[in-house]
Design a protein with these regions (language model features):
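Short beta-strand/loop motif that positions the catalytic acidic residue
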Residues: 121-122, 127-129, 133
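Catalytic histidine neighborhood in serine/cysteine hydrolases
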Residues: 32-34, 147-168
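Primarily recognizes the serine-hydrolase "nucleophile elbow" in alpha/beta-hydrolase
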Residues: 58-120
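Serine-hydrolase catalytic machinery in alpha/beta-hydrolase-like enzymes
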Residues: 2-73, 84, 89, 164-172
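Acidic beta-to-alpha connecting loop that harbors the catalytic carboxylate
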Residues: 11, 131-133, 159-161
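Active-site nucleophile loop of the alpha/beta-hydrolase fold
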Residues: 10, 38-39, 99-107, 130
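Conserved alpha/beta-hydrolase "acid-adjacent" motif
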Residues: 16, 134-140
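Catalytic active-site module of serine/aspartate enzymes centered on a nucleophile-bearing elbow/loop
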Residues: 58, 160, 169-196
Length: 196
């Protein structure tokens, strides 16, 4: 049975953003993909809703997704969308979580970590992180991962930022497409492992 991806956007850009659409196009090669937007985005506001409302919107989108598939469901999200997916998985059963740039440290502050939800998880999770992401220093993520109960995996993008983008000078002979294809392969492997 084909996997189903519920793809949540980050805080700053809606699901129509080219970055989201580009990844949606890739994910369609593995399974069915549905994107959605949080209420504040639909209302044209910049500031995200409070956590309970973000979770409620995400759960509503998940309920709609369940009506469309009986296959394995994966919550995938860019930054905030991945974090909210983690919260949703504490209340709803899904096959796995895929976080594209998890925002571990609030506003890049190493003392304010959004790690409790990760410690509470039972759902398998794949982190896709850039090594230059100020919102998720890899040393801090490593410490959190060591204390997590859920099966957790990390795909690191050397030189990648919060949007998984690698600067030209760091790419060498590679292209961003090469980097993205490796991310896609990691996602594909994770999904295959947890699709039963």
């Amino acid at each position: 049975m084909k996997p189903f991806f519920l793809f949540a956007p980050g805080a700053g850009a809606p699901s129509s953003h080219p970055w989201m659409q580009g990844w949606k196009k890739r994910l369609v090669e593995i399974g069915d993909v549905v994107t959605f937007d949080y209420d504040y985005m639909l209302q044209g506001r910049r500031r995200p809703d409070r956590l309970p409302q973000l979770i409620a919107t995400h759960k509503k989108a998940l309920a709609a997704a369940r009506a469309k598939t009986s296959g394995p469901i994966f919550l995938i999200g860019k930054s905030m969308g991945g974090r909210i997916g983690c919260h949703v998985s504490l209340e709803e059963t899904v096959n796995g979580l895929i976080c594209l740039g998890y925002p571990l440290s609030a506003m890049g502050d190493r003392t304010k970590l959004r790690d409790q939800v990760l410690r509470d998880l039972a759902t398998p999770i794949l982190f896709v992180q850039g090594s230059r992401d100020p919102l998720c220093p890899l040393d801090l993520l490593g410490k959190v991962r060591a204390q997590m109960n859920a099966p957790n995996f990390l795909h690191t993008i050397e030189g990648g930022d919060h949007s998984l983008h690698v600067r030209k000078k760091d790419l060498g002979a590679e292209t961003q497409e090469d980097v993205d294809l490796r991310v896609f392969a990691a996602i594909k492997d994770f999904v295959a492992r947890f699709s039963e």
